[in-house]
UniProtKB/Swiss-Prot annotation:
One of its GO terms (cellular component) is plasma membrane. The gene is PPI4. The lineage of its organism: Eukaryota, Viridiplantae, Streptophyta, Embryophyta, Tracheophyta. GO terms for biological process: regulation of proton transport. Belongs to the plant Proton pump-interactor protein family. It is found in: Cell membrane; Endoplasmic reticulum membrane. It is a single-pass membrane protein. This is Proton pump-interactor 4.
């Protein structure tokens, strides 16, 4: 079988040759690799060959879709690099956070002496570590937000690439279908089934011609697909071999080919108005719309990132304010505790001094009070002394125990006075009674 590409009546055609030798019933197939082989005339004299033509469909890579796929692929690459960079930063920040937490735990678990200087140093270190830890937490939260945005952007780009590839494959459905047909034709040619091969070729050509005659969009699409192969083989758009003596310039590319194609003859007088209508302005309009949509998407994404950044700044400021308030509160509480401790120490000192003075005073008053009572009893004065009015001084909360002791001692003194006076009265009465009965 020989698979060679020919151009006939404006269509890109693939020719399949198959044949049999007179002396051999098995089919023989020649391929493109065998074209360079040298055969003798005796081998080819008895061969009967058949030639079938199939319309070849080309795969068309739309430049717009290709540009979009390249752009999305570039965006995915940038997103992956940003993700790796953010992941490395997150790893370092988390390691720093763990080290700070460990150092704070060691400081908290230390057995601190009661010396105030050491406590102040440790508190200052804990405060500085807490500030650094809060800053690292804010940075980690910001990096997490950036990571989520990057991953979301990458996922959208991947979905866009999948959609564009599906769109490209959908546009090249005719190409994949023609590949299946050509594979089947090659198999039939290899097996020597000429009848089925002829039926297949006729049916495919009829299908193509019916669509060519009835569908203008199909004609335009096929012309667009065939242009690259025509330009590569230096053929005209009416599919005739270029005139070597002509003044046609092939250096200008597809634009010169499309412009000069209008000057040549059309395939038929009915299709003169349908040939090579290239909607340049429509393409430009579509491109502008797509560019506007892309710019809007980029603006929305930038706005979202800006909003996230502002929100993180607000949170950071609130955390800083809360940390400053907490520090001020801790300082005030520490000052209050220090003042209370100082007051308690002063009160203890005052209580100790006042208790010693009161004990001395009570001993002196008891000794002084016992002397005049004895003198009064000896002089025969009144047994019941006058009660003296004592002016008690107000003492603080720490002198309650001392006051109770003084009151108890005074009560004991009064009882002792009452017993002595009653005994002094009872003795003379008893003596009188005894003398009366004795007489």
């Amino acid at each position: 079988m020989s698979a060679s590409i020919l151009l006939c009546d404006g269509f890109d055609v693939r020719r399949i040759l198959t044949g049999k030798l007179n002396g051999d019933e098995s089919s023989t197939v020649t391929t493109e690799e065998d074209d360079e082989a040298v055969f003798s005339g005796e081998e080819w004299c008895g061969e009967s060959s058949y030639c079938f033509y199939f319309v070849k469909q080309f795969a068309y890579d739309d430049p717009e879709i290709k540009a979009k796929i390249d752009e999305a692929d570039h965006e995915v690459y940038h997103c992956n690099t940003d993700r790796i960079h953010i992941a490395n930063r997150l790893k370092s920040k988390r390691a720093a956070r763990l080290s700070l937490v460990a150092s704070m735990e060691t400081l908290m678990s230390m057995k601190i002496n009661e010396v105030e200087k050491e406590q102040e140093v440790v508190r200052g270190r804990i405060y500085r570590l807490g500030e650094r830890l809060s800053e690292i937490k804010m940075e980690i939260e910001l990096l997490d937000v950036q990571m989520a945005c990057v991953l979301n952007q990458r996922d959208k780009a991947v979905e866009r690439i999948k959609f564009l590839r599906m769109q490209r494959d959908k546009g090249n459905a005719a190409f994949y279908q023609s590949r299946v047909v050509m594979k089947k034709a090659i198999e039939l040619a290899a097996s020597g089934n000429v009848r089925d091969l002829e039926e297949l070729a006729d049916s495919e050509v009829e299908k193509f011609m019916s669509r060519w005659n009835n569908d203008k969009a199909f004609r335009d699409n096929y012309k667009k697909r065939i242009l690259p192969s025509v330009n590569e083989r230096k053929l005209r758009c009416d599919v005739q071999i270029r005139d070597l003596e002509g003044n046609l310039d092939t250096e200008n590319g597809n634009e010169t080919v499309v412009k000069k194609a209008i000057e040549y003859k059309r395939f038929s007088t009915e299709e003169e108005s349908d040939d090579f209508d290239i909607p340049v302005y429509e393409k430009l309009g579509k491109e502008e719309k797509e560019i506007d949509e892309e710019t809007l998407k980029e603006k929305k994404r930038e706005e979202q990132l800006e909003k996230a950044r502002l929100a993180m700044e607000r949170k950071r400021k609130l955390h800083e304010k809360a940390a400053a308030k907490a520090v001020i509160r801790v300082k005030k509480e520490a000052e209050k505790k220090r003042k209370e401790l100082d007051k308690r120490a002063k009160k203890k000192k005052a209580v100790c001094k006042s208790s010693s003075v009161d004990v001395d005073r009570t001993t002196e008053t008891v000794s002084e009070a016992s002397k005049p009572e004895k003198e009064k009893l000896l002089n025969g004065r009144s047994v019941f002394p006058k009660q003296r009015s004592y002016n008690y001084r107000y003492h603080g909360k720490g002198n309650d125990a001392v006051l109770k002791a003084i009151i108890k001692r005074r009560k004991a003194y009064r009882l002792w006075v009452w017993t002595v006076s009653s005994a002094a009265v009872a003795l003379p009465l008893a003596l009188l009674v005894v003398f009366y009965y004795v007489r």
